[in-house]
């Protein structure tokens, strides 16, 4: 596989450990939700998302009901756009207060910097909101890496297991699918990207997946343990 025209990467389980997201970020947002909703429910950046949750679920517009719904979604790792937007706002305070910094795998940091230095456009596609993605890379233990990226995509462009989402991304960045490599730890996402012609790489880290995965469709994708093994 030669150097691509652009690289699109997932975050959780790909550039960063699953445990950081599930054991640090998710619990932090869960704990902060009651106070956040109480203090910001009328804020113009918050109210539309709470309204959406109430309308879609038939939940009475009360703080307790909304918090209970959102916490359940966190517990089940829901990718709902409203939840991701609200989580991002909560995490912003955590980053600003120095409550945590982002974990990034050293091999990912090294390759991201090298690709940027080689003028390869880098893009992020994650279920987390774009502001949350930017915070994630801005407040990492390796420093502010947000400037390495040319663009950011979240579920507003479509679900990560839907091939049309990758078509929209390719159109947005102006590069044919065959010129783009997508890096992810989720086989269903890679299948969707490959369906419209993206080159795909399954990142199968032992820290996140102790047993190498040899499942249906695994062999459709370049299958590596880390960014260090990438041939470009």
UniProtKB/Swiss-Prot annotation:
Signal peptide as annotated in the record? none
- From the UniProt record, list the reaction(s) this protein catalyses: 5-methylsulfanyl-2,3-dioxopentyl phosphate + H2O = 1,2-dihydroxy-5-(methylsulfanyl)pent-1-en-3-one + phosphate
Q: How is the cofactor bound, in the record's words?
A: Binds 1 Mg(2+) ion per subunit.
Which pathway does it operate in?
Amino-acid biosynthesis; L-methionine biosynthesis via salvage pathway; L-methionine from S-methyl-5-thio-alpha-D-ribose 1-phosphate: step 3/6; Amino-acid biosynthesis; L-methionine biosynthesis via salvage pathway; L-methionine from S-methyl-5-thio-alpha-D-ribose 1-phosphate: step 4/6
Answer whether the UniProt record assigns the keyword RNA-binding to this protein. Answer: no
EC annotation? 3.1.3.77
* Cofactor(s) needed by this chain: Mg(2+)
Instruction: Name its GO BP terms in alphabetical order.
Output: L-methionine salvage from methylthioadenosine
Q: GO MF annotations for this entry? A: 2,3-diketo-5-methylthiopentyl-1-phosphate enolase activity; 2-hydroxy-3-keto-5-methylthiopentenyl-1-phosphate phosphatase activity; acireductone synthase activity; magnesium ion binding
Superkingdom: Bacteria
Q: Which InterPro entries match?
A: Enolase-ppase_E1, HAD-like_sf, HAD-SF_hydro_IA, HAD_sf
User: Which HAMAP family does this one have?
Assistant: Salvage_MtnC
Give the family per the record.
Belongs to the HAD-like hydrolase superfamily. MasA/MtnC family.
Function comment: Bifunctional enzyme that catalyzes the enolization of 2,3-diketo-5-methylthiopentyl-1-phosphate (DK-MTP-1-P) into the intermediate 2-hydroxy-3-keto-5-methylthiopentenyl-1-phosphate (HK-MTPenyl-1-P), which is then dephosphorylated to form the acireductone 1,2-dihydroxy-3-keto-5-methylthiopentene (DHK-MTPene).
Query: What protein name does the entry list?
Result: Enolase-phosphatase E1
Q: Which organism is it from?
A: Xylella fastidiosa (strain M12)
**Which gene holds the coding sequence for this protein?**
mtnC
């Amino acid at each position: 596989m030669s150097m691509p025209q652009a690289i699109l990467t997932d975050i959780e389980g790909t550039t960063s450990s699953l445990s950081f997201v599930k054991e640090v970020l998710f619990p932090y947002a869960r704990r902060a939700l009651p106070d956040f909703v109480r203090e910001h429910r009328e804020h113009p950046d918050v109210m539309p998302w709470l309204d959406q949750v109430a309308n879609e679920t038939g939940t009475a517009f009360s703080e307790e009901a909304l918090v209970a719904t959102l916490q359940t979604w966190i517990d089940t790792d829901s990718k709902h756009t409203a939840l991701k937007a609200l989580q991002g706002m909560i995490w912003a305070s955590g980053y600003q207060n120095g409550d945590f910094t982002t974990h990034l795998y050293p091999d990912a940091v090294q390759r991201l910097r090298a690709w940027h230095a080689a003028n390869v456009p880098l893009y992020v596609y994650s279920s987390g909101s774009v502001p949350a993605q930017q915070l994630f890379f801005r407040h990492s233990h390796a420093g502010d890496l947000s400037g390495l990226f040319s663009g950011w995509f979240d579920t507003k462009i479509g679900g990560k297991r839907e091939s049309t989402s990758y078509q929209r991304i390719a159109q947005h960045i102006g590069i044919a699918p065959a010129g783009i490599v997508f890096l992810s730890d989720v086989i269903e996402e890679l299948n969707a990207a490959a369906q419209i012609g993206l080159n795909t790489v399954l990142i199968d880290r032992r820290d996140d997946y102790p047993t190498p995965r040899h499942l249906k469709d695994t062999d459709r994708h370049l299958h590596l343990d880390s960014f260090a093994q990438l041939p470009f």
